[in-house]
């Protein structure tokens, strides 16, 4: 009798332990399910911006060009598109210029197809200038979350010593009004720096770009009055060997800084990183 009672108690204890274990497992599964959309989209759970590069159905290239620059060099954008899926679908490319004018072109991508444009604005839009381009394959007629694509962007130019390029980060998260920072700018006889933003809203956007040196001293402030749906860039009018920019937009925006070698026009693109205390 005593043996049977002890056996029954051990069985009940084991069942309770298994029940508690299942509850903990279910709590973990539910927590993971909440985080999964952010993980799948390549986003940090505390931000709308991408944490890693992933295939997507909506991508912003924050800076594109087909324009003559400060030193007389012509800057062009090389865009590479790749469809890793088994579907054939269109990607709508929307070019936003400095005035907020928007031009749309549909690019059909076959399954497994790759397209490369050495002068994207000239080849696709038959235009010159500078701005930003949004690529979209889901929020269009006949779109689907299955129509994912991969994109790579570069601004390049040719000088007497050869070809030089600047890799441009592509963005898959939404624009926001949060403060953001671009660290590592430089302005001297060898390098120049620009700050810019794409206003992803239908309202005028006043973006205050505060420039600090490495000791956190405010050196200068550049104010960008960006029209609705427009892109704007301006030079940093100060000399500093190392510094950073704090962007404060009044409307949702994608902001960046770019450091350019004055001799080669080789550049370093620095997308602004959001910071929310």
PLM features per residue range, with description:
Residues 40-277:
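Gly/Pro-rich, tryptophan- and cysteine-flecked surface segments typical
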Residues 11-12, 31, 159, 234:
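Enriched - but not universal
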Residues 20-29:
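Bacterial N-terminal signal peptides that target proteins for export
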Residues 29-37:
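Bacterial N-terminal signal peptides
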Residues 1-21:
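Short, Lys/Arg-enriched N-terminal segments with co-localized hydrophobic residues
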Residues 14-16, 37, 41:
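N-terminal start and proteolytic maturation junction detector
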